Amino acid sequence: MTSSKRAADRADQADIQAVSRVSQILSLFDPATLDVTAAQVAERLGLNRTTAYRYCTSLVAAGLLERNADGGYVPGGLLLQLGAFAIGHRRVINLAPRHMQALSRATQNSAVLCLWGLTGPVVSRVEENPSTIVVVSVRVGSHLPLDTAQSKVFLAYHADQLSMERLMATLSGPALDELRTEVARVREVGHCAAMSTPGVVAVAAPVFDEYGICATIAIVGPDNTLSMSDDAPELRVVVSTARELTKELGGHYRPDGPE
């Protein structure tokens, strides 16, 4: 191998590493982390502060980050523009609101639509029911953990089952065994009810477009009013809503069997 070839290979590897590092930095943001400092980036990613600062400065120049009044970094205009563009061009986002409003009214609970993010469901739209005294809701943009009903539905029906298995393998012991059992049950019955937060029940079903699962639709409510039973009337409404939205998207509702 010539020296010029080796130099080119090293440059390619450096470019790939830089892209990976940028992804890691942007992944630090979530609903609980609205801004970060270069010191926090360095600590969380195992970088020295000079390198972290250099990355953050470059991302500001590219429009992916911005400086706030406190000197920290927040998502930049280009990132927000791309995010809005990506979400806005998901057909399910445009078609779901009418179905979610009807679902919320019919069940007297908040309706929640989730799309699949990098490593799990992301809350993309919420329709609250204002007629109830106690409103249980969830913030748009929240990343849901693996033990939620929405996660289990995605794990059951996602097209890339190898990646789903790797994701589940981040757990171990009884927690992993329990999750695999529950995901298998979702494939069998076509829906999931779970209480991942004490006192709060979520009942979820999959939504499909022509390519496969594209979202989950769910209701969330207090455990003293929202049943986790397979014959609960609220569950029937959730499944019916998921089936109707799937039909409107041109998909096949897989829990109903083969096409």
Walk through the language-model features, giving the residues of each.
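Amphipathic alpha-helical effector-binding/dimerization core
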Residues: 71-167
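Short, structured helix-loop boundary elements
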Residues: 15-19, 76, 89, 93, ...
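Extended hydrophobic
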Residues: 175-247, 251, 259
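Amphipathic alpha-helical regulatory segments at dimerization interfaces
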Residues: 28, 44, 95-106, 110-112, ...
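Conserved beta-strand cores of small sensory beta-sandwich domains that regulate signal transduction
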Residues: 66, 112-114, 194
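N-terminal helix-turn-helix
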Residues: 2-87, 93, 243-251
